[in-house]
Amino acid sequence: MSGSNPAVSINKRKVAPVVLAILDGWGYREEIEHNAVRQASTPVIDALWHAYPHTLIEASGADVGLPDEQMGNSEVGHLTIGAGRIIQQELVRISNTVKENKLITNPALNQFSQSLKKGGGTLHIMGLCSDGGVHSHINHLCGLIEWAASKGLKSVSLHLFTDGRDTSAKSANKYINTIEAKIKSTGVGEISSLCGRYWAMDRDNRWERTSKAYELLTDPRFALSKLSAAESINKSYQEGITDEFIEPVRLSSSFLKDGDGVVFFNFRPDRARQLVKALKLKDFDGFERKNRADIDVLTFTQYESGLPVSVAFPPEPLNDLLGQVISDHGLNQYRTAETEKYPHVTYFLNGGIEKPLKGEVRHLVPSPRVATYDLQPEMSADELTDSCIKAIDSGIYSLVVINFANPDMVGHSGIMTAAIKANEKVDSCVGKLLNSIGKLGGSLLITADHGNSEMMIGPDGQPWTAHTTNPVPVILIEGEKRKLSGYGNDIKLRQSGGGLADLAPTLLHLLNLPKPKAMTGKTLIEPINLPKKPNLIPQPAY
């Protein structure tokens, strides 16, 4: 599937492109043990690392606007790359609000509670119950329970999605204990259902998964379990089912009915959209909805423009983004990824802008229809590479951005052999890309948005399925037609202090475009020490 843009300008002379290849989840860790990056056979990237300018940059914590020691993720990573500056992320923004007890003054939440009390409906709070900090945080859920208590809401049902992907695979009981303690201390709420995120938080249009979560929430005939939340989780473990895949289970008689209200506390949109659309959209064709309730929905952040929901923390607009600079200078750009990472190279890289910019073409390659990607670690990398090469060969794009999902999506499986195969496939694809770029004299900048597959076993000896706080590599292969004036063959990359926010300024430097003042990141290309001469033409400050 490809997106077209009639505003793309066609130039008879082929353009030497600058290509940004994002190897999603390809972090750097020196140790070889349990490291699917180091253990993979990657002759292309190994050779480029040794032969061309390279460095390591930070992709987690404060360097991407997250709390210290908080692992990075694809949304935050691409947002930071595209913005060229460090942005306070939603995790920090909402955490500060909860910490300062300011949920009680949030206008959207207060209007929501007033409407709910007036109608006498039940408040249903749902979302990912963990401290992973990628899609949600348990502190936000605790804050919501306290908010509900402060507003005098008596009928409160919690529908909790178990993690096991951004956390340890069998850690759900720890979070359930925290929530049960909060329920006891406030006297508000009950855990009404449990469901693994595999079912409730799909983002790949696997509607058969979303429908199972939907039925759990809406079907009055859904079987009521006699087990407690903890007992249900332990039963799943006994059956070999970890947190991510826990089957939907109803723990109380509460389900969504007309006049009820839902607060969805995930702050990251991509894995919350499908379920919200199923719950709220009138025109919906993902699956047949047998039990549609007339409910109000409030989401913590804007999951998608145009959704008929209230938003507690609306987006803060960003300007002077990488894509906008390219577009404003009349240049064409191409963005491509497979399904799992398509929103990241488009929506997130553009700072939350839904529609393509002038001169921007987007191309989606479908991800394979498998239960988990360790079953097909190559994913759709070959098809993705072939489509990107066609775009490069067309000679009409100044900037090309491609995301390889394999290291991250297969890394999440925790299966070492599969992650190694995934990384080897990406390495071979980078080689094909480089050959195509070289024919036009273009430049290639290789990096990652966060770490993952470089650590497959955690400190507890269990499979590590989450992201990491490790740095990520950057390699610059400068093309003959993209040589920066004055550097010759002596171009070097900054060896310390770099982060994802420095990538947009670096790309603009390679494209010989000015960096906007709003971009506080700095080019990773080291300045050259030219002898002082009179009347030199001032150069842009990157």
Swiss-Prot record:
Entry GO MF terms: manganese ion binding; phosphoglycerate mutase activity
Gene3D superfamilies the record matches: Alkaline Phosphatase, subunit A (3.40.720.10), BPG-independent phosphoglycerate mutase, domain B (3.40.1450.10)
Catalytic activity: (2R)-2-phosphoglycerate = (2R)-3-phosphoglycerate
Listed pathway(s): Carbohydrate degradation; glycolysis; pyruvate from D-glyceraldehyde 3-phosphate: step 3/5
This protein's UniProt keywords: Glycolysis, Isomerase, Manganese, Metal-binding
Binding site for Mn(2+) 1: D408, H412, H467
Name of the protein in its database record: 2,3-bisphosphoglycerate-independent phosphoglycerate mutase
